[in-house]
Amino acid sequence: MSRNYNDELQFLEKISKNCWRIKKGFVPNMQVEGVFYVNDALEKLMFEELRNACRGGGVGGFLPAMKQIGNVAALPGIVHRSIGLPDVHSGYGFAIGNMAAFDMNDSEAVVSPGGVGFDINCGVRLLRTNLDESDVQPVKEQLAQAMFDHIPVGVGSKGVIPMNAKDLEEALEMGVDWSLREGYAWAEDKEHCEEYGRMLQADPNKVSARAKKRGLPQLGTLGAGNHYAEIQVVDEIFNEYAAKKMGIDHKGQVCVMIHSGSRGLGHQVATDALVAMEKAMKRDKIIVNDRQLACARIASPEGQDYLKGMAAAGNYAWVNRSSMTFLTRQAFAKVFNTTPDDLDLHVIYDVSHNIAKVEQHVVDGKERTLLVHRKGSTRAFPPHHPLIAVDYQLTGQPVLIGGTMGTCSYVLTGTEQGMTETFGTTCHGAGRALSRAKSRRNLDFQDVLDKLADMGIAIRVASPKLVMEEAPESYKNVTDVVNTCHDAGISKKAIKLRPIAVIKG
């Protein structure tokens, strides 16, 4: 017997200006409560989605995000609560922007590939330069073209960095250390990556031959979809101290943002794991509310195989972003006829938006070892956390939030409050408001390109037909998302960036 919209509302309670609680009973078998963070505009979108679902209008075959947050709260071994961040929108199994942590010492606790996503370690890297907007404007088109020429982009794009099967095995195991050894990265790049750009539990043997075959030609490529490289300028500085630590000292300073993941390799790792886990669930009698939430006990062979394969795909994504950093440095050096070093093209930080990691957190006054699933959400550790780079010990971890094409992006910093409320996690971007198919129906790609040109943004796109899917209209407002996190105290704004050129798959 399905409930109507008003019945559903009985289970939802506003607990603060920016936070709602999802009470047990909203979906069956909830082990813990759910919460989601919103402001007024985002709240309206969340409730509209629920209302439509009650009328029988599903979201492209996915449950509404609120229901998905509830279903995650019903997974075995979950602790504290299932958390939806302001950019949450429905996805495969877990909503994108839903994070959850599972107790490693609970033998029932599970790992779920749907809680990481298909694009494993999809993430963002930000580079700074010592250039000013006035240096770049006259050569903006040239620079966009140079980046487009250097970085292979698009759906089936192939890498320019030479790589054979043995190289791939090593890259899967070593992450950024491989890039460093091969001369595609600077030593200090590594310091400024989450996990130092290498997940140690990676095992290339847990990545199938099919996944490797998909991954081999794609290294150092941008891919299509919401992946992009953007030349940006600093538009606003909210926290001068944090900005200085990141090497940002004035408005108009030029940066480059690279947004990419593990391409076909990560997708295949996830697909392979879901197949293996369906069988494991039958064997271990694991019941879930939604079959997209296929999972396995963390300690089971399937659970361990997935975590080792996921870590390898994560390393692949870090190598991928390192390769694109190398190509970006070359493109800039060529246009400005100098060296990347002289342009001060340093990595500010590199974060992952889709990953599961073992971390220590205090829950109900006790330190516990948890497997933290972050899907469409970003680690945001506070000042003095042992896992963040020395340079950022006093500011908290930099958190990179990519806006959508042609809108602004942000750099935030992690907070102590986020550590207690959300396991040191905050939003990751704008979050879709329209499905990809709807975006294609409602928007014309030429309009989208014209609009960017009107805003003075140089654009290079490999597949123009895919542009509508990524048009700003398809997304929630990134400023709403970032401000909600800021007001809720789970991360703080440091820098706002606006694009002047965008390169896209």
Swiss-Prot record:
GO terms for molecular function: GTP binding; metal ion binding; RNA ligase (ATP) activity; RNA ligase (GTP) activity; vinculin binding. The active site is at H428 (gmp-histidine intermediate). Mn(2+) 1 binds at D119, C122, H227. Binds 2 manganese ions per subunit. GO terms for cellular component: cytoplasm; cytosol; nucleoplasm; nucleus; tRNA-splicing ligase complex. GMP binds at residues 226-230, 353-354, 402-405, 409, 428-431, 504. Transmembrane segments: none annotated. It is found in: Nucleus; Cytoplasm. Keywords: Cytoplasm, GTP-binding, Isopeptide bond, Ligase, Manganese, Metal-binding, Nucleotide-binding, Nucleus, Phosphoprotein, tRNA processing, Ubl conjugation. Ligation probably proceeds through 3 nucleotidyl transfer steps, with 2',3'-cyclic phosphate termini being hydrolyzed to 3'-P termini in a step that precedes 3'-P activation with GMP. In the first nucleotidyl transfer step, RTCB reacts with GTP to form a covalent RTCB-histidine-GMP intermediate with release of PPi; in the second step, the GMP moiety is transferred to the RNA 3'-P; in the third step, the 5'-OH from the opposite RNA strand attacks the activated 3'-P to form a 3',5'-phosphodiester bond and release GMP. Belongs to the RtcB family. Catalytic subunit of the tRNA-splicing ligase complex that acts by directly joining spliced tRNA halves to mature-sized tRNAs by incorporating the precursor-derived splice junction phosphate into the mature tRNA as a canonical 3',5'-phosphodiester. May act as an RNA ligase with broad substrate specificity, and may function toward other RNAs. This is RNA-splicing ligase RtcB homolog. It comes from Papio anubis. The lineage of its organism: Eukaryota, Metazoa, Chordata, Craniata, Vertebrata.
